[in-house]
Structures are given as C-alpha cells and as structure tokens.
Amino acid sequence: MPLRKPLFATGAVLLSMFLALLLAEVGLRVYFGSREPADFAAVLRRARNAPRTGALALGQIVQASAWPDIVYELRPGLDGTFRGQTLRTNALGIRGAREYAREKPAGTFRIVGLGDSNMFGWGVGEGEPYLQILEKRLGPRFEVLNFGVPGYNGVMEVSTYEHRAAELAPDLVIVHFIGNDFGLPHFLQAPEEARSLLHSYLWELLQARFGSKEDEVDPGLLPHDRSQLDPELRRQARGRYAHMMGKDAYLKAMNRLGELTRARGIPVIILSLGGSGEQGNLARQAAAANGFTFLDASPRFYRYLVEQRMRDDREVWRSTFRIPHDGHPNRLAHELYAEVLEGTIRSLAERRTW
C-alpha cells in the first residue's frame, strides 16, 4: 500500500506532462495548419538562431528562398569563416562586406554575376573571389555584385536574376557556366505536403531551439545528405525540382534570360573554362541563340602554363589552378578569371553612354 501513493503521484505527473505536450502540439497544428508553410519556417528560423560568426558550415550560410525556383540563397549579415577562409555577406545576402544601394548611383556601371560555388569563391577568402578582384581592377565607376551561391544550377541562376538582381538595374550580366548547371540543386525545400499527422510541430520547434547547431540547415530546407530521409519524402522532393534538371531546362532558362535582358538592352557574358564536349557545346549554342558573348577563359590559363614553363597535363593543371583535394578554383585561378573578364567588360563599357 505505501508504494501505491508514490506510483500514483508519478503517474499523475507523467500524465499531466503528456497532456500538456499534446495540448501544445494540437495548438501548434491548429494555428499553423491554416497558414502558409513559410510562417512556421520563420518561427523555426528564429528559434534556431543559427550563428552568423565563427566557423560556419555550408548549411549555416544558406536559407530557404521565398521564390520557388531560387530554392535557397545566402544568409545576409554573415561575418565568420567558411572552410577556413573569411566569409562576409552584406544586407542583400550576397558575398562580400561592401553594401550596395538598391538604386544604382548616377554614373555607375553595375555588373551582376550569376553562378555557383566557383563564382561564389568556395575555399578562398574575402577579396579573393574573381568578381571582387574584377571590381577592384575596374575602378570606382564600376560595381560588381556577386550573386553566386554554392550548388546553384542554370534555372536557379536565371530565377535569381529575374527576382533579385534585375531590380538593381544592372548594365551587364555575367553567368559562370559549368557542367552541373544541368543538375539538381545542392539543397531542396521540403514538399508542402510533407508534414503529415505523424509529424510533430512541437518536436521540430524543440529541435530548432535546443538541437545541435553543427552543420544543420535552414528549417525550410532538407539536409544535403538525404540518404537518411524517408524514401517517399526524397521522391517527392526530387519530383518537385525535376523541371529544372537536364538540357531542356537549361536551354529554357537561357532563353528566359535572353528575354529579360534584351528587353532592357543588357549584354550577357557566359564565362566558361573550356566549354567543349556536349554540355559546353550546348552552352555555346544557347549563348549564340540569345546574342550572349561566350567567353572561354582557358586560353589565358594555358598561356600562364607556357609563361611559367610548366607542362600542360591534367596533374599540373590541377595542382596549379585548383584547391588541393577540392577541385574548386584557387586564388591564382580567380586572378586569371578576373583578368579575362576585365578586357571584355571595358570594351562593353566604352560603348555605353555615361
């Protein structure tokens, strides 16, 4: 008999806790069930309070985008390190500490760059991505805004121009072409129907507030490693973005960029390193069809090897122009990209009425 009272008290406490949690879950479901998914994602984002300083993982430097075909974008106001290199983003959520007015200053030639991790500057520090080098080389009349984000494909880049960059009144657009412009985005947003009756709003909220911050992603995004996700959720997520994969999607995106830029008389440069093979030829054809300039930087890279009396083979190329064990352009490669772009851009700018 004496044992029954403590057991009863413990049971009562546990039941009360269960009912409180159940009530909280029901309340969250009732409130957010009739609202947009982005509303709950915003609450999770505030609860998560992801760091903006210190050593940042890839999942901590991006956030879900409000535009479906952009999918995700850089978080504004970052001031830390990424892959051991300094990283800053400004109020627009683009790489670099320099702030740009939304209204273009008089007498300014404004350039926007669209690309993935190569343009973003994966593995190099502040001042070292080629668009930052280019801006410095061109001088004070020029602004170069880097909208490059790791893992972007061609459709995302054009959507970024349409919904984010076009309103900044650019005079020139640079698109960095590489082979994965035809592939799936690095991160995906979860399908809106993914939150089922078995999925807990309360658990997500607690995870966002108290869970590990190590390499986590924005609440509106699925983790890059999707192997641990439910197979049906993976299938739905991939299906949601099937329209932006493959050569037809790329060609459609380039045609859309052509429509948007021709209407305002804005020239477009497609920057590539080589641009041969099936994918490169497709990019060349898309550029020609839309009146873009296809700029192959590889002759300058080859000339550098000649100047340094180095062999022209794959291993020498990799060790000279790539980050070790990574494959992304190193500081030297970014310098050469900037050099290649500078001459072409000065020629275009001279034809502009200031």
Where would I find each of the regions flagged by the language model?
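Solvent-exposed, polar/charged alpha-helical surfaces in well-ordered, non-transmembrane soluble domains
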Residues: 132, 136, 159, 163, ...
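Serine-dependent acyl-ester chemistry module
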Residues: 178-311, 315-326
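Membrane/wall-proximal cationic-aromatic binding patches
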Residues: 36-137, 305, 313-316, 320-324
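Generic structural signal for small/hydrophobic residues in well-ordered secondary structure
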Residues: 25, 116, 157, 173, ...
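Helix-to-loop transition at the C-terminal end of transmembrane segments
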Residues: 26-38
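Histidine-centered active-site loop/cap adjacent to the catalytic His
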Residues: 28, 247, 317-354
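Conserved SGNH/GDSL esterase-like catalytic core that processes O-acyl groups on lipids
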Residues: 86, 110-112, 118-199
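Hydrophobic membrane-insertion alpha-helices, especially the h-region
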Residues: 11-26
